[in-house]
Structures are given as C-alpha cells and as structure tokens.
C-alpha cells in the first residue's frame, strides 16, 4: 500500500482547496451545473436524481484498518451511516451534501485517500485480485505493479480527456479473480522464459455491451 510523501500530501491538499472554491462558486451561482460538471467529475462527484454521489478510490482494493475506520466515520457524519462498495473496488457515498464534500475530501486525505479519477473519461482506479498477497495459487503479488500504473496515470495530462473511461486490472494468479478479461487492458503476471513476464488482454468491458477481451501478447518478458 502506497503511503503519501510530502509531494502527495501537497498535491492532494491543493486539489481539495481548488475543489472547495469550485463548490462555493457553484452554490453561490457563480458556476452553472454545466460549468461545474467537468470540475466535479475530476473529483469523483456525480449528480444523481435526488442527490450528489461521491466515489472514493481504493487502489487495487487494499484498505488499512485506519482507512476503513475513516470511511465509517465519513458515512456516519456525512451520509446515512453506510457506503456502497463497487464492482471495481471503490466505495461510493450516495447522499452527501455538496457543501460537505470538500470536508469529506480533507478527511480522506488524513488517511492517504482521495477521489481523483474515479469518474469521467480518464484512466480509472487500477484493480487487482482481491486475494493478492494471500492466495495460494499466486505467482506474483500484482499490487506493486498496480501501484506503478496508478502513480503513472494519476493526473497525467494525456489521460484527462479520453473519448471514454479506461480501465486496467492486474492479476498474479492463473485464476482470474480480478476479471482482467472484462477490462480495457488486463495484465496477467506469469513466468516467461524463466523470468517474470506478463500476458496482455485488451478490449474487454462490462456496461451495456459487455465483451471479453482478447489476448494481444501471450507473454511479454
């Protein structure tokens, strides 16, 4: 699990300050909903029929006890006492008030969490096998590789305005618990010529038109 360094802390602090100002402008009428939409989506905020929803990133599905306690506290203080874990290992709060969301983001930052790139047409949360690090059939722990991809793709300028959202998953076991074939790119860690390599699946997806990805590379060293 990645722990924030000074750069991470400052980066998230500035992002949260910017969004706090954007929320104030929206509530005061300084921004229309159309103007506010791309700004809120960059911070994981959706507009539902009756309320806003905040989706929080849980990189490769790994939470510490401290982070889980913080999520429970946020649910009690700002929502209805519960959250909704998603298929791709995030958590959603479905009833926060817009005015409270900047405070929620600040609370998340206290435990090295944020909601960046959990919505919008960008590279989304990188997921992995939920038994990573503990599975008996694991060839390699996929979490360090998922973390490298997460760091590389977060706030990358080339990935902020993609045609559609883009999803990546990594597994290190022969049993596909990470459902890598249902992702735009699925990476399977495996032995290749006596060393660690990767099998690459591409073109998968769920949603309205689910499709299984196809193998692009059988084993890259």
Please provide the spans of the model-predicted regions.
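N-terminal start-of-domain structural block
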Residues: 1-5, 81, 221
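Internal alpha/beta scaffold segment
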Residues: 206-221
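Conserved histidines in hydrophobic membrane contexts and catalytic metal-binding motifs
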Residues: 198-201
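Small-residue-enriched alpha-helical segments and adjacent helix-cap loops
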Residues: 24-31, 46, 51-195, 215
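Charge-rich, low-complexity segments
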Residues: 1-42
